[in-house]
Amino acid sequence: MIDLDEIIEHFSKSISTLRGEISIRYFEGTSGVQLASDVFLKEANGKIWKTFENPVVIENLSGTRQFAKYVEARVDKKIHAKVIIPAYEHSPWIKDVIEHKDKYLLEIFLVSPKEYPLEASIAISSPWVLIIVAKKQKPFALLIKNEPLSVTVESIHDMVWNRFAN
């Protein structure tokens, strides 16, 4: 049985249409996840990112130091983030981030992990979508550039966000 990772690797690390309507890049491993995140930070020029995060998973994969550097780089670019986090409890580092959310240019909603189980982190800054699956055994990231997809994922984020904002 062939899995998705093998199929993607077999065809290419990058898929794009001739008209440039979509670009999909696959990044494998911890270093690949970091590289995809760095590309997203560089290319996604919007001033507000909308994200679904499971920081515990990312924290376990790359550590708090690397994650903190990334947050600082985002803040240096003056990019705000609207973050939806499914959790009841957090590590001391995440508690500190939540406590100092204004410093980190964050708006955060905590949601039930039972109602909104997130196995992946998703960041949207049109036309970009970054998807990170940070499982220890086989972490990977997909970096997708496609306006209709980013608008759709952003709409889903807005629906969840607005549910808790009202």
Regions found by a protein language model. Name each.
Residues 11, 18, 43-47, 82, ...:
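Short secondary-structure junctions and interdomain/linker hinges
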